[in-house]
Every structure is written in C-alpha cells, then in structure tokens.
Amino acid sequence: MTKEQQLAERIIAAVGGMDNIDSVMNCMTRVRIKVLDENKVDDQELRHIDGVMGVIHDERIQVVVGPGTVNKVANHMAELSGVKLGDPIPHHHNDSEKMDYKSYAADKAKANKEAHKAKQKNGKLNKVLKSIANIFIPLIPAFIGAGLIGGIAAVLSNLMVAGYISGAWITQLITVFNVIKDGMLAYLAIFTGINAAKEFGATPGLGGVIGGTTLLTGIAGKNILMNVFTGEPLQPGQGGIIGVIFAVWILSIVEKRLHKIVPNAIDIIVTPTIALLIVGLLTIFIFMPLAGFVSDSLVSVVNGIISIGGVFSGFIIGASFLPLVMLGLHHIFTPIHIEMINQSGATYLLPIAAMAGAGQVGAALALWVRCKRNTTLRNTLKGALPVGFLGIGEPLIYGVTLPLGRPFLTACIGGGIGGAVIGGIGHIGAKAIGPSGVSLLPLISDNMYLGYIAGLLAAYAGGFVCTYLFGTTKAMRQTDLLGD
C-alpha cells in the first residue's frame, strides 16, 4: 500500500468511516469531503495525521494534503467507495439495522436549514465567489500550460533578436509554440461560456456559442457592426469575459423558460434556436458595449491605483492578499487579471499579489530556523515549503501560519514589503494567470525578470526577519505542537 493510500484510509477513519461520507471531490491541494454527521468527525485526529497540512470546515470538510498527493488520495477514496469522485456514496443497511428514512430525511432537512441560516449574512457574496471559482478554476491548468509555452516562445524570440540563436527551425518552433498558446488565450471566451453555462444550469454548448459570438468571427472588411451607444465599430472580444459571463447567465434564464413553454416534441429544435437568437442579439448590441465600458473602467482604475500609488499601493495589495486567499475572496480578481491581459497584454496586479505567498515562504523559513525542537512543525514545513516556493500557498496557510497566528501576520508584512518593491519599480506584469512565486518568472512581461526577482527576495527577507524577530512564541520554539 502506498503512503497516499494509507493517508486516504486514515482520513476516512478520522471523519467517521466511509458510512459517514456522502461524497468526495478534490481541487488542486484539498480533498473535499461531504459528511453525513459532523459529530462523528474527530477533528484533532484528522489534523494530526502525518501528511495532513490543514483542515477547513465549510459546506465540505476540506483536508489540505498538497498538490499531486491530493489526486492520489482522492482517487483512492473514490475506489474504496465504489463511485466516481463527486458522486453520492450509497449506504447499505442490513435488515437488523433498518433505517428510518423519514426521520433521516427530517434530520437532513433540519441540518441543511440550519446551515443555510448560518450563511445568510454572506450568502449572496459567497454564491458570486463560488460561481467565479467554478468557472475559472477548471481553466487554471490550461492557463498555466499555455502561458508557460508562450513564455518559452517569448524567450526564444528574444534570444533570436539578440543573435544568440538562429535558424529556420527555431522560427518554426516559436510559431508552433505561439499557436499552442493561442489555442487557449484566443478562444478563452468560448471556454468561459461553456463553464459559465455549466455553473448557471444552461446547455454548455450554447454557452460556448455565446462566448464565441463575442469574438465577432463573421465580421470582416466593410461588414462592420456598430456600437449602438457610441456609434463606433464594435471590436472583437469587446466586453471580455465579464460580458460573456453575464450573457450566459441571461442565456440560462431564457433557456429554462423556453423549456417550460415549448412542447417536448419540438423542444430540441426550437429552444436552442430561439435562445441563441435572443441572447446572441442582446450580446452583440447590448451586453458587449456595456460590458466593454465596465471592463475598460475597471482595468483603468486598477492600473491607476498601481501606477499612482506605487510603493504604497504595492504594500497594501501585497499585505492584504493573504487574508483574501484565506477567505476565498481572491477569486474575485480573476476576471480583472484576464481583462488586463486582454487589453494591455499583461496583468500588473498579479506580480504584486504574488508577493503575499513569497512573504509566507520567508516566514516559514524563519520558523524552520527558530523552532528546531518542534518536530511536528518542521515535518509539516518539509511538505509545505517546496510547493510554497512554486506559488502554491494553501499548505502553508492552513497547515502552518494560520494555526500559529503570529507567523500569519508577519507573513503578511513580508508580502507587503515585496509588493512595495514591485510597485516602486513599476511596469512588472504577467502575461498569463495561474502560477505565482518562482513559477511566475517565465510569464513576466517586457523582460522585467530582475524586477520580479527583486520583489521575491524582498518578500522572502521581509517575511523571514519579521517572523524571526516577532513571529514566534516560547511554546512554538520549545514544544512539539502546531497550533491549538
């Protein structure tokens, strides 16, 4: 049995056994477990399992085990359950243990009602953030892969211009790499439309068509469509993904209404046709111009804050981004990043935000040095630090800095210092989203690699010094405990 399989089985035992698990799924770093009875979960045992870097209680119990490991752990849990990831796990009861389904249903409804009430205050915001995450998180591997391939093409192109390399085959290779990159970035509106349709309950194919509509692929030469508000020609992609998401949301409403009123015999023909016609026209003549104005204004405001605020803005963004990640609010910036890339070829917000993770790495290094007697902490750091350098910060957040308290605050200060350096230098952008930390380096635009490295080093140093001096307690240094 592999260590990942052992980890999976220990997690199952800690959450009350397979009989207490309703379903299992995973993201990039966390196994997400929906349990039937929270009272059967042994939280302390779960947190102290070797390999578990943190535990978050939400709608699902989220067990942080790190990238790579998470897929193997989740897949083994799915194998043991006999169902696919995300599917409900059937629970069989023998005759001597007959289940009172009526009572069970009533208890389940009561629990769901209480959970719903507990989330009423932030319900709408949580729903928006969850929708944004569900639309874009599946695209992150494509962003990373396409972005890195585009970064390699840019490096090769620069080397050719400088005269270090030459040859027709190099030119062809650069062309091929750029074609692969554009396979994602040029058709992002279509991918966004498909995922938005899944999120809002529309037909994914129709969502892709609406996304593709914004590209105006049928417009050429004199067949120009005009912006009904300004009288200027509409531009392909105007309104960006903000317009696509809103249009697909309207599509979901229209399609659902049509399904209710169109006879079943002709539903497959009439509903998609009318839905595309209505929403397509609205998208071209209403949503694209309005969303274009919104996205242009949003990007202008963000760029203005970064360029005018400089060091101050950089510090505030870098210092506050880690708490936003902790709360899951960082997903709200994904559409902004993408719009900045669409309009100017780079997002100048991402390199500053990436300093938050670098500050946390510096804090973790200080903990490694200061807390030599704390073997539990050092064992956790062994798994969380390497991926932290690569920009995956959740294992450090939930497994180290947040449970300890003080190091989380000093890590934020380190992130602010790195952000101040990036903001002070200025014009340091990223050509794609997805990675951060060292992994973001190949995606830095306009050859501003040294500026980004300077920011990373400043964040590492700031997080290290602040944590070394102020971020530990006697208990952290002399006991073998992690958090409370």
Swiss-Prot record:
Positions of transmembrane segments: 135-155, 160-180, 200-220, 234-254, 274-294, 305-325, 349-369, 384-404, 408-428, 450-470
Classification via Gene3D superfamilies: Glucose permease domain IIB
Pathway entry: Cell wall biogenesis; peptidoglycan recycling
UniProt topology in membrane: Multi-pass membrane protein
SUPFAM superfamilies: Glucose permease domain IIB
Record key words, sorted: Cell membrane, Kinase, Membrane, Phosphotransferase system, Sugar transport, Transferase, Transmembrane, Transmembrane helix, Transport
A cellular component term, taken from the record's GO annotations: plasma membrane
One function term, GO molecular function aspect: protein-N(PI)-phosphohistidine-sugar phosphotransferase activity
Domain notes: The EIIB domain is phosphorylated by phospho-EIIA on a cysteinyl or histidyl residue, depending on the transported sugar. Then, it transfers the phosphoryl group to the sugar substrate concomitantly with the sugar uptake processed by the EIIC domain.
Function of the molecule: The phosphoenolpyruvate-dependent sugar phosphotransferase system (sugar PTS), a major carbohydrate active transport system, catalyzes the phosphorylation of incoming sugar substrates concomitantly with their translocation across the cell membrane. This system is involved in the uptake and phosphorylation of MurNAc-GlcNAc, the principle peptidoglycan turnover product of S.aureus, yielding cytoplasmic MurNAc 6P-GlcNAc.
PANTHER family: PHOSPHOTRANSFERASE SYSTEM TRANSPORT PROTEIN, PTS SYSTEM N-ACETYLMURAMIC ACID-SPECIFIC EIIBC COMPONENT
Protein name listed in UniProt: PTS system MurNAc-GlcNAc-specific EIIBC component
Gene name per UniProt: murP
